[in-house]
Amino acid sequence: MHEIGEHLTTNTGWDIIKNRYEAAQAITEGSNFMIGNGFMGYRGTFAEDGKDAYAACIVTDTWDKADGKWEELSTVPNALLTLLHVDGEPFIMSEEAASFERTLDLSQGVTSRKVSQRMKNGATITIHEEKFASYRKKHAVLMKYTVESDQDTDAVLDTGIDYDVWSINGDHLQGHHYFSHPTGDGVTAKTVSYEDTVTVVETCSLDADASEEDYQNPDGSGRTFSLSLEAGKPVTLEKAMIIYSSNDVDNPQDEALLEAKHMQSYEEEKAANRLEWDNLWSHYDVTIQNNIIDQVALRFNIYHAIIATPVHKSLPIGARGLSCQAYQGAAFWDQEIYNMPMYLYSNPEIARNILKYRHRTLDGARRKAKRLGYEGAYYAWISGKTGDELCPDFFFKDVLSGRDIRNHFNDWQIHISPDIAYAVKKYHQVTGDDAFIRDYGAEMIFEIARFLASHAVYKPMRGRYEFMRVQGPDEYHENVDNNAFTNHQAMFTLQAADELLQTLDEKTLSAVKEKIGLSDDEISLWRDMLANTYVPKPDKHGIIEQFDGYYDLETIIPAKKVTERLIKEDEYYGYPNGVTVRTQCIKQADVIQLFVLHPHLYDRKTVELNYEFYEPRTLHFSSLSPSSYAIVAAQIDKVEEAYRNFRKSVMIDLLNTNEAVSGGTFIGGIHTAANGASWQMVVNGFGGLSVHGDDIHLSPRLPDAWDGYTFKAIVKGQTLEVDVTKEQITITNKSEDRKPLTLHIFGEKSVLDSERITKSR
């Protein structure tokens, strides 16, 4: 047993175990111990839990705006609700339980609970409950619920479908229509704003003699089993919950009933699901030698990154995954910058699917640009079903006055578009997938370049183009000019567009130009911008100013001293009147993020100087920030500092270190971008993996806390396994059809033209 945190342990490096029940941790543990499969996320709650315990099943592609303000994914009726009464007394979880253990088995995506509790009649009741969301049947989540008594007693099990579920911003389903089938019940309802049909069907079987009586009321339907528990003889209830919507199939009820009819036993479905998880881990697992806590924390994060990612069709990865409705189940820049790299190097088809979502929603980006007076594609800061902007104008409240704060995430944070162009270019660079560029990528990059050209302001007195009234990754400083990260990303996009204009075959280029109406005058403008756009460069001290006027702001070091200026603990720190706005205190990596994306852009000395300048000015109040600093610290051989940030990042959810409410808005749930970044910290950070031009670069560093680590990466269709120990680095080409690859290991050029190459450290 290895201790992760208070009452939190692991046995094998594949399990998370909590051995104390704490009612106050319902939000956190509901997220941490959740199950999912990219189609749905079922929170890690218990069978008897309702909305007061934040029980919910969140389903992809069910966006709705029930309250007229927030468009978010719907929580669907819960078909696993099971209530136990023993001799008339309800079984209710107590912090005084005789024994309690809950486990998340990362290896196969199973969450479980085993609890023993003494009832008023003297019987000690033991419940063993486990659930999983099937990767074999992505519309199904299954539960096995076993109850045992140490003495003979009467019991009642109420099990069915709970319609009255937890939802952050209104009830999204209406007009619930009940129906039954041979092995259970079902319900069909419609979303409020889009009128999409959602069907939930349950199957139910009990392995004991019991009388059965159906029930139906406005809050749900199901059946009541009345039975006698014999001392020492367990009774098991097996349930499946099957979910379909009209966004998946034409007739959700028929499809759900058909799947229910062919559902196998819990153990058979669990075995099939285990095979699917074996395959998933063969792609994504990163092993750490001789540090089981870091190992399990890393796997915990990778697990949550996996289950948050839709793979059944092109849909976004939500900023809170499918753990809750916070951030609306929609994509931010996180998707391409923090989540996609793991897929890019481990399972490129998923990376392709992520980018296809951005192509599918290109019209939404065009609509946003046009609405705001621009051309081309200005991608939504918060993007859901259609790519239209979901980010409200008023995201936070001023907790001092109670008034809404007008934030400008949705109209000033323009870097979202060049970030997507960056992801397209990086995908092509790593995979060599020319077909994607022809069919999707070129159109996206050209439309983003078109947007940037329409946004840029030409300053005749300075003879240059500038990007004004923007907001960089540091969200506390809005309405700034020439944010260094934004301007660099814009130039990267224009360069990518220019390269495509020169390298695409004539037929493809003509077709894309005709499709989007791209003129020669526009192309000339792009090339003029390439030559004359202002890009902040290192000053005489080697520092890149984050934005115009940043140096004029008040210096507060360390940055967290700014918290002493708060009047109320939960007030918003940022624009327009937060305590950081007139200071150099920044929310998260901004200039430093530039070095994460472009590790070869500046020399090491420049990176070091900027790291040392910005790190003490960074609050790290975004879950995205520690991972960015970890990656860059590893690049410049601040290995132990990188390791400290690695630990901080991978423990954000496990140890619940980030706030659930900011500026009066609920932002709880799993931090999906930090989950994805956990993989990057090892592979791109400590491993130093990058692709620059046609070559692969590796510069592996090893924290003192580890004896070694191993990861896989797919580059140009070749699967590499990188094994790092204290003595050496071994790179093995695991591909069946091996091809020569040019490597740069610590800057020394090598050609991997055999099975493996070994270098001393």
From Swiss-Prot:
The reactions it catalyses are: 2-O-(alpha-D-glucopyranosyl)glycerol + phosphate = beta-D-glucose 1-phosphate + glycerol
Q: Where is the active site?
A: 475 (proton donor)
Q: Name one GO molecular function term.
A: hydrolase activity, hydrolyzing O-glycosyl compounds
Q: How does activity depend on pH?
A: Optimum pH is 6.0-8.0.
For this entry, list what GO says about its biological process. carbohydrate metabolic process
Result of changing residue 327 to F: Abolishes both phosphorylase and hydrolase activities
Q: What is its EC number?
A: 2.4.1.332
Give the residues the record marks as binding substrate. 333-334, 587-588
Residues holding glycerol: 327-328
InterPro entries named among the record's database cross-references? 6-hairpin_glycosidase_sf, 6hp_glycosidase-like_sf, Gal_mutarotase_sf_dom, Glyco_hydro_65_C, Glyco_hydro_65_M, Glyco_hydro_65_N, Glyco_hydro_65_N_sf, Malt_Pase/Glycosyl_Hdrlase
Query: According to its UniProt entry, what is the function of this protein?
Result: Catalyzes both the (1) reversible phosphorolysis of 2-O-alpha-D-glucopyranosyl-sn-glycerol (GG) from beta-D-glucose 1-phosphate (betaGlc1P) and glycerol and (2) the hydrolysis of betaGlc1P. the betaGlc1P hydrolysis is a glucosyl-transfer reaction to an acceptor water molecule that produces an anomer-inverted alpha-glucose, not a phosphatase-type reaction. In the absence of glycerol produces alpha-D-glucopyranose and phosphate from beta-D-glucopyranose 1-phosphate.
Quaternary structure note = Homodimer.
Its family?
Answer: Belongs to the glycosyl hydrolase 65 family.
Q: What is this protein called?
A: 1,2-alpha-glucosylglycerol phosphorylase
Q: Which organism is it from?
A: Bacillus selenitireducens (strain ATCC 700615 / DSM 15326 / MLS10)
